[in-house]
């Protein structure tokens, strides 16, 4: 790629990542020059080494580390994979390339053929499946404290955003209020986006892309001065980071709207406190003060303090019976430390008692105007959300 076409922020990010990779991995050469076994100490990416920081409301990686030595037969292949992947990423950085995680898998996949002193031939693949190379990339992230986005490694775009906002991406200014019926796809390197100007009072993140499209076409974000985002299901890293930046840098409150079921709750928790599998990223990806707007169990059934939004007839029409997997997942979530607040325990208890769930679309079935101009704004105004 011509350097003239590369933005200044891209060049700076590329240089920073390349310098960091070089500084970290050159230590292996120093160990060899000192006649020491080349060894890496990498933080463990395990459930047992994941902690919930009650004060910061984040899932974080603990302090346990594993030693990966080239001379340890149990670790030598993983050592080789780590060094190989780091070299491929480094080459891409210094050559102005933007590889995808799939590209990296193919670039590194080959067979290593060796002969022992007796002439016997051995053949070993660098990796067989992409999940192997993906895991190695994660190891490099925790080893270097560089996220793959920092290393300009691309992934498929998933999240979308629309609103009264201008951003700079590369050398272009993009107006997110002029997307027609479409929306801006959140790029896989959201830290390279500059916020130019914005006219909004809050961020609404919607789990379902279909509901996002309905709210967009209804003009919800225009009427209520909102930045409207969809994660299109489980959020990818880019969407989580983009939402975090909107909250942290622009001080916009964040509200999450999901289905009323355990999977919707978990999507909310991933946005708010991070995920167990990627706890090492939570400090940069999670939004600890994000609020669960709904759809809540009390929205459906009400309680002693609140009337339901659905009538008895509407409940019969829209409610879905929870499956065994839903019950099991709810029971698991109930025991997570970050769900042990009074409000969340109340929410989960209603679900387990009623054994019922509801999709966001049910609220739209009462009428799109009800969802966009009554349900959502009423809940925000009355602070009817769970934290």
From Swiss-Prot:
One example GO MF annotation: DNA binding
Cross-referenced PROSITE patterns: TOPO_IIB
Any GO BP annotation: DNA topological change
Names of required cofactors: Mg(2+)
Domain Topo IIA-type catalytic: 12-160
CDD domains: TOPRIM_TopoIIB_SPO (cd00223)
Catalytic residue list: 106
Disulphide bond pairs: none
Pfam families associated with the record: TOP6A-Spo11_Toprim, Topo_VI_alpha, TP6A_N
Cellular component annotations (GO), alphabetically ordered: chromosome
UniProt-listed Enzyme Commission number(s): 5.6.2.2
Residue numbers binding Mg(2+): 207, 259
Keywords of this entry: ATP-binding, DNA-binding, Isomerase, Magnesium, Metal-binding, Nucleotide-binding, Topoisomerase
Catalysed reactions listed for this entry: ATP-dependent breakage, passage and rejoining of double-stranded DNA
Superkingdom classification of source: Archaea
Family: Belongs to the TOP6A family.
Complex and partners: Homodimer. Heterotetramer of two Top6A and two Top6B chains.
Function of the molecule: Relaxes both positive and negative superturns and exhibits a strong decatenase activity.
Designated name of the protein: Type 2 DNA topoisomerase 6 subunit A
Organism of this sequence: Sulfurisphaera tokodaii (strain DSM 16993 / JCM 10545 / NBRC 100140 / 7)
Gene behind the chain: top6A
């Amino acid at each position: 790629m011509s350097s003239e076409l590369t933005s200044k922020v891209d060049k700076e990010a590329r240089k920073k990542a390349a310098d960091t990779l070089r500084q970290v991995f050159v230590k292996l050469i120093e160990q060899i020059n000192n006649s020491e076994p080349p060894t890496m100490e990498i933080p463990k990416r395990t459930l047992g080494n994941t902690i919930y920081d009650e004060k910061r409301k984040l899932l974080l990686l603990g302090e346990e580390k594993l030693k990966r030595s080239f001379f340890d037969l149990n670790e030598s292949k993983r050592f080789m994979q780590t060094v190989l992947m780091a070299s491929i990423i480094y080459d891409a950085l210094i050559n102005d390339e933007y590889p995808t995680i799939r590209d990296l898998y193919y670039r590194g996949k080959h067979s290593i053929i060796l002969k022992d002193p007796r002439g016997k031939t051995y053949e070993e693949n660098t990796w067989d499946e992409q999940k192997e190379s993906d895991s190695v990339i994660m190891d490099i992230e925790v080893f270097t404290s560089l996220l793959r986005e920092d290393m300009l490694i691309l992934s498929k775009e998933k999240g979308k955003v629309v609103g009264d906002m201008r951003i700079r991406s590369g050398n272009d200014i993009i107006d997110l209020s002029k997307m027609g019926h479409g929306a801006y796809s959140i790029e896989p390197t959201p830290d390279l986006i500059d916020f130019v100007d914005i006219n909004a009072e809050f961020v609404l993140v919607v789990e379902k892309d279909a509901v996002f499209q309905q709210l967009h076409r209804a003009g919800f974000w225009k009427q209520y001065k909102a930045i409207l985002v969809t994660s299109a299901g489980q959020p990818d890293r880019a969407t989580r980071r983009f939402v975090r930046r909107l909250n942290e840098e622009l001080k916009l409150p964040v509200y999450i709207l999901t289905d009323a079921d355990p999977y919707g709750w978990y999507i909310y928790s991933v946005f708010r406190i991070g995920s167990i599998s990627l706890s090492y990223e939570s400090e940069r990806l999670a939004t600890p003060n994000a609020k669960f707007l709904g759809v809540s169990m009390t929205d459906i059934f009400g309680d002693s303090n609140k009337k339901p939004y659905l009538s008895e007839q509407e409940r019969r029409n829209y409610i879905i019976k929870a499956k065994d997997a839903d019950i099991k997942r709810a029971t698991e979530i109930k025991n997570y430390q970050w769900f042990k607040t009074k409000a969340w325990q109340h929410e989960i208890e209603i679900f387990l008692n009623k054994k019922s769930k509801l999709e966001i679309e049910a609220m739209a079935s009462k009428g799109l105007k009800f969802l966009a101009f009554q349900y959502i704004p009423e809940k925000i105004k009355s602070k009817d959300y769970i934290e």
